[in-house]
């Protein structure tokens, strides 16, 4: 009787990094993926036709990888795009991994065994299910870092032990950079280009709603996944992002729940600008 290869049974991860003129930040991201001791990794770099040294960093990365003891697949595409979420949708379409994680330039996987930790959590959940179904989502925690890569501490919002689509009524409790989506589901639910700043919030909810409808597991890896740069698109456009998130919450949770939750947010954070 032929036995399956245990290595082949492990999930393959696509780490997708969207870049544009990111030479000052991308090396930190590259090195964190390069350091992973897990072999089934595709690092997909979708570049928006950068004019700085971003691609030079990628080419050096590819050269180092060709000589590495643990080689990962590195794929780079550089062409003009229509913005961040258009590039992220390209990454979804190009991904060959079973799970996809978006890691922006300047963000980093927390430790060399991060992907191994997530893979073990996925396999444990799969083998404990009756039909050995692959989880819809795996998630974990994040730590904030500054531009120098120094850890500032955890995010204000923390991931729950058990995550469902309803959890996001309380805000984006799981950072996008710590949310591994089953790639098949990601292709069913591309980022909605109507949202300029918060399409990731909507995307995560839609994938988790699918998981609930089809009884697919959502797995807590119970580890820190990423060091998250505390200066992203949402941070730079905070007010516009909040308005989009309000619309997204109304879409998924209805007016009553959304208004009630925003009243709670205002009472908890009276000095926080909305």
Where are these regions (language model features)?
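N-proximal low-complexity "stem/linker" segments adjacent to membrane-targeting elements
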Residues: 1-35
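Cell-envelope/extracellular polymer assembly enzymes that use nucleotide-activated donors
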Residues: 11-14, 42, 202
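A conserved acidic beta->alpha catalytic loop
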Residues: 39, 47-56
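Acidic donor-binding/catalytic loop of UDP-sugar-dependent glycosyltransferases
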Residues: 53, 86, 107-125
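Glycine-rich, basic loop-to-helix element that forms the pyrophosphate-binding segment
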Residues: 77-95
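Short aromatic/hydrophobic "clamp" motif used to bind/position activated sugar donors
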Residues: 100
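Short beta-strand-to-loop element that shapes/binds the nucleotide-sugar donor at the catalytic cleft/hinge
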Residues: 138-150
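Conserved nucleotide-sugar donor-binding catalytic segment
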Residues: 140, 154-240
